[in-house]
């Protein structure tokens, strides 16, 4: 089997999610360890081996009404890795993705054909993609309300959301109105929204402060404390397990977003029981400007 595998690869359980049981493997020894780990996290004791793609993870959203798909949004998941082999931490969701114009230009026609070929008449479709310098690869389509709460962002920008469309369809049989559907069509002048986590390293939390100050920063519209004093942070068991707090904020442009992100992380203080800083520093330039840091 190994002779047919081009490393690196991702090994994961076929029936789990959120990064649980996943490993990045770069040789045969790591592959054997990754398979054993994946089987431990799989009810079916079955591992899945995939190509490891080094690229951006982007969600592309389409609203479909009466059989007509229309490009709505593309968001981006920002991650960081704890080690050479560790699965990435989920750091942030950014609306829109830095790659949104490229994806709309290069992929819209193909994505519309795909959705039409499936015979979907009404709904909000998410296409999870890996984006590299030379390709955009769809690897997980979803036909549900997304866990990134993109409907909240849509509501704040346009006054309507896909959740309201689904409720209307359940009650009346009509998937919203054409006028409201038009409001969910992407426009390049929409502001930037980001949901970012304060990532914590291993240790027992002895002090957690600053979130009240964060709530008063311009653009911040929601703050949620996920971990509390006394909680023990261990090595990552899933992509979300290291988040100490979630902050949601908006900004009119990337420069303003960068300033506000700095204010947020300057305000947050988390120390372990020995007084050591537990907050893992993030690359705020990448969150604001993208990996090219084209300012």
Predicted feature descriptions by range:
Residues 1-47, 54, 65-67, 93-109, ...:
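Active-site nucleotide/adenylate-binding loops and adjacent lid/helix of ATP-dependent enzymes
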Residues 20, 29, 51-120, 124, ...:
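ATP-dependent carboxylate/phosphate-activation module, predominantly the ATP-grasp catalytic core
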Residues 8-10, 45-49, 178-180, 221-224:
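A short linear hydrophobic-aromatic micro-motif
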Residues 167-295:
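Peripheral (often C-terminal) accessory segments that flank ATP-dependent C-N-forming ligase machineries
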Residues 9, 70, 137-140:
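Protein kinase-like catalytic core scaffold
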Residues 5, 131-137, 238-243:
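A short, glycine/Asx- and small/polar-enriched loop/turn
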Residues 50, 121-133, 178, 279-284:
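A short glycine-rich, hydrophobically flanked beta-strand micro-motif that places a catalytic Asp/Glu
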